[in-house]
Amino acid sequence: MGSLFRSETMCLAQLFLQSGTAYECLSVLGEKGLVEFRDLNQNVSSFQRKFVGEVKRCEELERILAYLVQEINRADIPLPEGDTSPPAPPLKQVLEMQEQLQKLEVELREVTKNKEKLRKNLLELIEYTHMLRVTKTFVKRNVEFEPTYEEFPPLENESLLDYSCMQRLGAKLGFVSGLINQGKVEAFEKMLWRVCKGYTIVTYAELDEPLEDPETGEVIKWYVFLISFWGEQIGHKVKKICDCYHCHVYPYPNTAEERREIQEGLNTRIQDLYTVLHKTEDYLRQVLCKAAESVYSRVIQVKKMKAIYHMLNMCSFDVTNKCLIAEVWCPEADLHELRRALEEGSRESGGTIPSFMNTIPTKETPPTLIRTNKFTEGFQNIVDAYGVGSYQEVNPALFTIITFPFLFAVMFGDFGHGFVMFLFALLLVLNENHPRLNQSQEIMRMFFNGRYILLLMGLFSVYTGLIYNDCFSKSVNLFGSRWNVSAMYSSSHSPEEQRKMVLWNDSIVRHHSVLQLDPSVPGVFRGPYPFGIDPIWNLATNRLTFLNSFKMKMSVILGITHMTFGVILGIFNHLHFRKKFNICLVSIPELLFMLCIFGYLIFMIIYKWLVYSAETSRTAPSILIEFISMFLFLASDTGGLYPGQEHVQRLLLLITVLSVPVLFLGKPLFLLWLHRGRSCFGVGRSGYTLVRKDSEEEVSLLGGQDIEEGNNQMEDGCREVTCEEFDFGEILMTQIIHSIEYCLGCISNTASYLRLWALSLAHAQLSEVLWAMLMHVGLRVDTAYGVLVLLPVIAFFAVLTIFILLIMEGLSAFLHAIRLHWVEFQNKFYVGAGTKFVPFSFRLLSSKFSDDLA
């Protein structure tokens, strides 16, 4: 848990890898995921690095594997995924694996090419068969003829499509037949008419069934056409037009006998092609099935091998070119494991000289590593979305685990809605190992990754719903109301009590639609409800007034407490980075400013709750009036909340006023004094460095007289940038801006926490409206068919509840809770200017086969 409170302590290590063992050592490091490599060749182009040839080889293997997977998927062969990830292949097996894959690719491409050629021929023959069958009915040929030229005979009794008649017209007759796409028929016919000027006769017929296109493989509707034309020039034009419209043109037989012979030959060839094609497909499937057994492991191995060579390209060679030098960031807790990994890699490679490491001092800021598990990962992602934490600063995710779902539940508080959300999240948690959940769509995967956040959000919503006594907009009477209506009747009191108090009788009850319970009447109010809000408030006409007052005060208390806690966490940062002057000159004035104004407001709210009861509530002073009078230095007309209130309030205002100049000028003046004081001891300006720690700029002395900080810059994780001179103006302006932002932020952020009240009220009112418009109407149906009406009403109510109150309202409360943490809470102590620790780990490669192919 200490790691979750603050990031891991990191160190910079130098690895000395022998050339013969570097590959195996990085393979072991990739399996363990211990270190993050630094690029020592930033000025070298990626095409000029040492292992660029090996990287290209891996890319070629990836291309081959992608082709194999494409063919396997096309054949509908299942791709098995291994339960365990295979290790990176040894170097001596890489060439063998490359030869096997290349040989398999060549064989597959050849078989696939032959298969496609056979399939195309088969489809063309099938089209030819259909064309012959359909065109047989187009025209009649009474006798076989040869084209000749004759005189023009009379045409009164001749059929237009009789070929003997056409022959006698004195022109040379030709035919073009084939198939055309259904969508191109009209344009095709218009083009023929315009180009051929009417010297063609086109006849169409639609095929009964769609056929597969031999070129594209798409199944479409086809039209069979037969074009009769006169003259060779017209024939050339017709053929060119057919080519432009991608028509499938086939030879047209001149005689019925020729048609019969062609048809018989086509049937024989089609049967032969079917037989050959089936055998080819069977052989291809056998090859693909055999390849599918090992393709998963090959893909993982190639990806690991490529990652290793990318890391090797980030290393530099020594002067002898026999040793690779790498610089890595490593958690100090994993240094022993790092040494063991290097020893294991050297042993597996069989090298005589082992690889080794040593730590080196550095003044650079290390990356941030916060170890998480499946429960804390979601909350850490919420924090990292704002900004990765600076090195070694307090991590808000530890507290977000509780505060985030709690603030969400304050806005979403409903026992019924929270219980439904809890059940949904619990279902995801119990089935978290189900493979379909990890491979689901993006929205469902988002819910799955945040299942523990949803679980706590639902659980806290149940808790706040019990406090609000709100279950689907209705109150639950678990312990019995503590308000007694019968005690308000005059018959239950003595005559003396009746004269002193306003009591009820039958006449008052009949003539007044609204009656008020007086808690000062004995027996009316019997103490507070054991847990949550009394259910009788659900019947009161002033229910909203009471709930608004309660939720508004609760929001203010929670908000100020949340922000004060953030300022206190900043003190832990200053202590850790040895900036103790920041505690006295920044954190304490901020706390005094916050507590003397807004902390006192919380005190007045709680004091009024404790001192004034229901019986004395009429004499209680208004907190709003008292708080305004505090700043106007006005005396209270009601005598105040407690004796000596004016003196206490003036003291608090005095402390608030005095804390502002300290907050504005304290830190810059102290740094100026520190700078001049150290200069008097003989340390020049060059003895100072400007330490950029997150977004702050502080000046510290690095000379031998530095007693407090000494040489702890490495421990503090500060990025040091040498500065030529001490710029007091820049430091002063930075601190003034920060102070103004904080003082104004205390007011605006406190008002921002009122969204807890606003969204809680909106959720409750929307839930109440939904109940009144649906369930209230459905439950009042008292006819014999009431059940039949109620069932669809309940179903519609459930659907609207899920989509509106759970999803839409839940998303709204979720976003507002994120806003409260990012802006109002984290800006009090969290800088978030770090870089995330990204280790060289094979686990970061996708474990799902479908993603590996992308």
From Swiss-Prot:
It is a multi-pass membrane protein. The keyword Transmembrane applies. GO terms for biological process: cellular response to increased oxygen levels; intracellular iron ion homeostasis; vacuolar acidification. The chain crosses the membrane at residues 394-412, 415-431, 446-475, 550-569, 588-608, 652-671, 740-764, 786-824. It is found in: Cell membrane; Endosome membrane. One of its GO terms (molecular function) is proton-transporting ATPase activity, rotational mechanism. GO terms for cellular component: acrosomal vesicle; endosome membrane; plasma membrane; vacuolar proton-transporting V-type ATPase complex; vacuolar proton-transporting V-type ATPase, V0 domain. Highly expressed in lung, kidney and spleen. Residues 413-414, 476-549, 609-651, 765-785 are vacuolar. InterPro entries: V-ATPase_116kDa_su, V-type_ATPase_116kDa_su_euka. Keywords: Cell membrane, Endosome, Hydrogen ion transport, Ion transport, Membrane, Phosphoprotein, Transmembrane, Transmembrane helix, Transport. Residues 1-393, 432-445, 570-587, 672-739, 825-854 are cytoplasmic. The modification Phosphoserine is found at S695, S700. Subunit of the V0 complex of vacuolar(H+)-ATPase (V-ATPase), a multisubunit enzyme composed of a peripheral complex (V1) that hydrolyzes ATP and a membrane integral complex (V0) that translocates protons. V-ATPase is responsible for acidifying and maintaining the pH of intracellular compartments and in some cell types, is targeted to the plasma membrane, where it is responsible for acidifying the extracellular environment. Essential component of the endosomal pH-sensing machinery. Belongs to the V-ATPase 116 kDa subunit family. V-ATPase is a heteromultimeric enzyme made up of two complexes: the ATP-hydrolytic V1 complex and the proton translocation V0 complex. The V1 complex consists of three catalytic AB heterodimers that form a heterohexamer, three peripheral stalks each consisting of EG heterodimers, one central rotor including subunits D and F, and the regulatory subunits C and H. The proton translocation complex V0 consists of the proton transport subunit a, a ring of proteolipid subunits c9c'', rotary subunit d, subunits e and f, and the accessory subunits ATP6AP1/Ac45 and ATP6AP2/PRR. This is V-type proton ATPase 116 kDa subunit a 2. It comes from Bos taurus (Bovine). The gene is ATP6V0A2.
